[in-house]
Every structure is written in structure tokens, then in C-alpha cells.
């Protein structure tokens, strides 16, 4: 309760929950979405998931290299990666939704998913770095409590994300006759969540 009362810690907790919820909600629906909308086989969608993970790895390395190269501005660099990663993730998800409505081979789904992976990887690792940096700020002897609070927020959001993502698609599918539109609605919701999460980090920078 005392840690939650700290403005920075409380706001960062909400950021962690919101961003990781959006991050994990796409996990279980991306491959079925590509299979249904673009007519890809299971093998092709699995390969696409591998491409996304490759993008994530690239994003992680890019973020790590930039913080090493600009050690004197680590906090600023981390916040840039967090905000940029969230915004780019939102854009990629919105483009996925748009591509699903277009369908066919006209949409560069490979590039879209790869860039989404880069955005996800960079923001996720930067968020962990920001978490460790912010843990030492505020009242002393609460570092562990802050990390525990943020870790709990991350764990809960990860547990809920995959479940809520699939449920949301099913519910949207009952309302919308077009499966691509149902998936698109969920992707747009995730994009909005990423944008909101980014605004929370912006507010932290203003303090």
C-alpha cells in the first residue's frame, strides 16, 4: 500500500500491467489470424512466428547496444525505447488489422510481423531496465517491494493476456460476421492499450 502510494511507482505499475497485457494478448491469436485471413498453412504461420521472434531478438540487441553506447543518458534512452517500442507496436497492430481486412497476398505480412517483433522486443527489455532503475528511486529500503509489485503486475497481465485475447476474438466473432474484422477489432484494442501505456511513461518523464 505504501509503495502503491508513491506516484512514480503506482504509475509505472499501471504501465507494466497495461503494456504487458497488450503484449501478451497477441500471442495466441496471431497465428490463427494469419491462417484464417491470409490462408496460410500451419507450417507457414509457425515460420512467421519464428520471424517475429527473430525481430524481438534484434530489438533487444538494438536497445542493449544503445544503452551501452550512451551510458551517461541511460534513463533517457530507456524511456525513449519504451515509448518508441509501445508506439511502434501500436502502429504494427493497427496495420495487421488493416491488412486482415485487405487480405490476399497484397499485404506484406512478413514485414509487418517482423517489425512488430522488433518493437515488442525493444520495449519489453527497456521496460525491465526501467523497472530496475526506478526501483531505487523514492523512499529507501523499498526497492524489493517495488520490484515485487511490478513483477506481480507483469505476471498477472501475462496470465490474463493470452486468455483475454482469445476470448475477445470469440466474442467479437459473435458480433461480426467477418473473422478478419473480429481479429482486427481486438488488434485495434491492443494498439490503443499500447498508446495509453506510452502516455504513462511520458507522464513519468514530466515529473
Residue map of PLM features:
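Juxtamembrane intracellular "pre-TM" segments in multi-pass secondary transporters
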Residues: 1-13, 37
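Short amphipathic helix-loop junctions that connect adjacent transmembrane helices
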Residues: 28-47, 170
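Helix-to-loop junctions at the C-terminal end of transmembrane segments
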Residues: 59-80
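A membrane-interface helix-boundary motif in multi-pass transporters
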Residues: 75-80, 167-193
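C-terminal ends and interior cores of transmembrane alpha-helices
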Residues: 83-104
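Multi-pass alpha-helical transporter architecture, strongest
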Residues: 97-100, 183-207
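Hydrophobic core of transmembrane alpha-helices in multi-pass small-molecule transporters
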Residues: 104-126, 130
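A late C-terminal transmembrane helix in Major Facilitator Superfamily
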Residues: 140-172
